[in-house]
């Protein structure tokens, strides 16, 4: 199945233009994922949109791999409507920096999607036009989808019910 990923048109074009940026290419159940260096995310996404016609950013999210380095992975799910092709781009982000450049200048839909990843996971999207909480209140402490966030919430006693 690795052949499917390696023969993917987008992967071939990305390897031609961004060879040093690509860390890994994977295929799982017919879906291709390209893991890239975070430093090149804007140029790479711009190329995907302008040259390869991936004109729809369907989601931006983050995954917390607590205990691993890098701890976070920022995930971009994109789709080419003209080519009827889906692609996933991932960029590792270390816990110490916890930053990546915004892709709002590439896809305007990134605005609220990046705000959600910031609010719930604490990923800072540099140069974002309006990076502030979107779901939690402004005075909320922490980022509730991180794996080290207390299950019972901040400033609350652990649950003493059936699970204790």
UniProtKB/Swiss-Prot annotation:
Protein's membrane topology: Peripheral membrane protein
Keywords: Cell inner membrane, Cell membrane, Membrane, NAD, Quinone, Translocase, Transport, Ubiquinone
EC number: 7.1.1.-
GO MF terms, alphabetically ordered: NADH dehydrogenase (ubiquinone) activity; NADH:ubiquinone reductase (non-electrogenic) activity; quinone binding
Subcellular location: Cell inner membrane
Entries under SUPFAM superfamilies matching the protein: Nqo5-like (SSF143243)
GO cellular component terms, A-Z: plasma membrane
Source organism superkingdom: Bacteria
InterPro entries: NADH_DH_suC, NADH_quin_OxRdtase_su_C/D-like, NADH_UbQ_OxRdtase_30kDa_su, NADH_UbQ_OxRdtase_CS
Catalytically driven reaction(s): a quinone + NADH + 5 H(+)(in) = a quinol + NAD(+) + 4 H(+)(out)
Sections of the chain in a coiled coil: none
Pfam families: Complex1_30kDa (PF00329)
NCBIfam families in the record: NuoC_fam
HAMAP family, sorted: NDH1_NuoC
Assembly and interaction partners: NDH-1 is composed of 14 different subunits. Subunits NuoB, C, D, E, F, and G constitute the peripheral sector of the complex.
Family: Belongs to the complex I 30 kDa subunit family.
Function of the molecule: NDH-1 shuttles electrons from NADH, via FMN and iron-sulfur (Fe-S) centers, to quinones in the respiratory chain. The immediate electron acceptor for the enzyme in this species is believed to be ubiquinone. Couples the redox reaction to proton translocation (for every two electrons transferred, four hydrogen ions are translocated across the cytoplasmic membrane), and thus conserves the redox energy in a proton gradient.
Protein name: NADH-quinone oxidoreductase subunit C
Organism: Geotalea uraniireducens (strain Rf4)
